[in-house]
Amino acid sequence: MDRLKIFITGLSGLLGKALCYEGGDKFNIYGTYFKKDIKCANVSSYKVDIRDKKSLDDLILSIKPDITIHTAAITDVDFCEQDKETAYEVNVNGTRNVLDSTKKVSGKFIYISSDYVFDGNKGYCNEEDMPNPLNYYGLTKLKGEMLSLEYDRSLVIRTSIYGFNPNGTREGIEGIIKDVKEGLTIQAPFDMYNSIISVNMLSKIIYRLILENAQGIYHIGTKRRISRYEFMEKLFLVFDLPRRNLVQIEFKNYQNKKIARRPQDVSLDTNKLTNDFKVIPTTIEDDLNALYKISSSYFAYFGGEQYVSEDL
């Protein structure tokens, strides 16, 4: 049986890299990056801006992927609030371009959305709850969902992620670890919640859903909601970071430092995922420990700078 062709936008991002790491030996992986190429075996990467409809069209039509996983997006919430035009061009029109090209080859389309489509007033949101984004980033992700769901071969995944980003910006947890090693203090709200999951665990579940031919909307996260502060506590414990460098703050104080409004509780109900596919959510402790165990091999896979393993 021929291996599935999987096309990933945003190869150089947190999730893009994890999808390569977790699927490179099982699928034929192709994809795009915007600025910085990734360095890993078993992946064919191309420098293409998803706003460039013709270049994207030409590439996808030449590859004819079975599955397209659209991870590329501007995820800086405050940037999106300040530069709405660029945010819309990338997060909405870019999604439309990727989707249109995917339709032309009759491929399946997987759209990575966000828990920020919700307003944070309820918590443990399920797939039937009405989205109500508080900021422009969340609005662009919701518009991307709406476009995706017009296609009958689409899967929308709402989630919140963390992970390593070898050779990338300091958006990964290696950035947090390096900041702490340099003596900086991390502030985290104790009353702001989500269901954050590592990109590696999320990637495994995405590949499971591909094989299950899942469609519609699914929420993916860890077993229970967790506050930003509690998550940092557990991260500090697993990676043996000094607790004196972690300070808890109130959500209102966190919000005051931001430009865009943030939802306070966007934890996700994942029962639909469990009921439909018997996927049992992991605990955040198991998730962090699994990430710790692969840290050296993960950075080596991408030829990345050893932010983490040299200090562990």
Task: Go through each PLM region and give its residues.
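N-terminal Rossmann NAD(P)H-binding glycine-rich loop of SDR-like oxidoreductase domains
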Residues: 3-26
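Rossmann-fold cofactor-recognition segment
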Residues: 42-52
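NAD(P)H-binding glycine-rich loop region in Rossmannoid oxidoreductase-like domains
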Residues: 50-90
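NAD(P)-cofactor binding segment of oxidoreductase domains
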Residues: 82-110
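Catalytic helix-loop patch of NAD(P)-dependent Rossmann-fold dehydrogenases
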Residues: 89, 93-97, 117-157, 161-164
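NAD(P)-dependent short-chain dehydrogenase/reductase
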Residues: 146-194, 199-201, 208
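Mid/C-terminal beta-alpha module of Rossmann-like enzyme folds, strongest
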Residues: 205, 212-258, 299-306, 311-312
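C-terminal amphipathic/interface module of NAD(P)-dependent oxidoreductases
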Residues: 261-312
